[in-house]
Amino acid sequence: MDLLSALTLETWVLLAVVLVLLYGFGTRTHGLFKKQGIPGPKPLPFFGTVLNYYMGLWKFDVECHKKYGKIWGLFDGQMPLFAITDTEMIKNVLVKECFSVFTNRRDFGPVGIMGKAVSVAKDEEWKRYRALLSPTFTSGRLKEMFPIIEQYGDILVKYLKQEAETGKPVTMKKVFGAYSMDVITSTSFGVNVDSLNNPKDPFVEKTKKLLRFDFFDPLFLSVVLFPFLTPIYEMLNICMFPKDSIEFFKKFVYRMKETRLDSVQKHRVDFLQLMMNAHNDSKDKESHTALSDMEITAQSIIFIFAGYEPTSSTLSFVLHSLATHPDTQKKLQEEIDRALPNKAPPTYDTVMEMEYLDMVLNETLRLYPIGNRLERVCKKDVEINGVFMPKGSVVMIPSYALHRDPQHWPEPEEFRPERFSKENKGSIDPYVYLPFGNGPRNCIGMRFALMNMKLALTKVLQNFSFQPCKETQIPLKLSRQGLLQPTKPIILKVVPRDEIITGS
């Protein structure tokens, strides 16, 4: 009390002015949506609506969609987000106005060399990367990579056979995480890693360290709430990604390039070699479009990011869905057996042409879109469908909420692969089903991811059936943090279909 009474009137006035200024700074953008009559949860000074994410992005988006309709306003700190579920607006953002207005994704802090990755890069730099990398994902290239991936399918089958013989239930994420790790390191870097049996391999350890992410990490939260900190962090050489992992991959790419200069190695088919071929093309060098060593490293690392978590999680979700829907599992196994009688080795064409397999995978991706949301930055003032969006604001498309919208999907919580049958698929609006995005900036590795997952499912379902056990969570509950994950690991009983196990 003595301290307070000692303060002069001028000091009190100064404190009041400072508090008013701080409040004004912390709420300076928060009137944007109110002016346009756009509803949304009430933002807090400085934090905006970020604290609501604690319930889980997916859950928050579903609740907002139910409460506010086709458009609502959010604030990540001071950053305004236009959340849209109107399909015409989504089409405008992802396709019609992609190159002119909504080309780029949002910045999320200091990312170092990862700013040169195709999924992070902006404008002309992104177009250049996309043009150089797109030939890597043609069906012809994927067919060439198919045998590389198939060998890891055989390792997967062998491991599951050993686990099934013990009679103990199996944690799906452990198994498919290892499969995804092996496939992505082999196809990205040309490294053969048996991560199930060699979890201490330096490549595995550095990759796993790189993949650790927490939405509530203090560094990440600080740049979400205060984007102006990003250039300061960059000046201080602070990066969102672990420096030792980035350095490891930079050195590795350099060593691999040196090793592959001989004529024998240069014919290997993987993403690293295909990027090196583009780098060494004389015409590309002269026109300054070839990928530099740093750019090759960034693309290789982003392939790991895009290929590991979505693949391993989606495969786990698929098998949980099949285990809890045995009739669907049996129907899929029958299709696989018809296409590949007597457990014949799968081929690229056979795997990609199986209709029911495609239906099951599509329905799983509808129920469990790993990324939850799509985002695009508005790079100039624009009006879309009568809504004014200022330069620098973000348009957010809540894909999870769209995928569970009863207006588009009857009984949306039910697992029904028949939604994606030939008869029904044509009636699905492409802007309400967005597991890989849409438009020019959709996921460049979509075809690779689908091939990879379909091959794994074909291999395991040729040889095993999956059943719930006492450790299986039914119904599945989703975690509140980060990418879409179950609250508990998916654990299932693995039962050999007969004594003939292919790939063993």
Swiss-Prot record:
The keyword Translocase does not apply. Coiled coil: none annotated. Pfam families: p450. PROSITE patterns: CYTOCHROME_P450. GO terms for biological process: oxidative demethylation; response to cadmium ion; response to dexamethasone; response to genistein; response to glucocorticoid; response to metal ion; response to nutrient; response to xenobiotic stimulus. GO terms for molecular function: demethylase activity; heme binding; iron ion binding; oxidoreductase activity, acting on paired donors, with incorporation or reduction of molecular oxygen, reduced flavin or flavoprotein as one donor, and incorporation of one atom of oxygen; testosterone 6-beta-hydroxylase activity. Changing residue 213 to I: In strain: Wistar. It is found in: Endoplasmic reticulum membrane; Microsome membrane. It comes from the Eukaryota. Belongs to the cytochrome P450 family. This is Cytochrome P450 3A1.
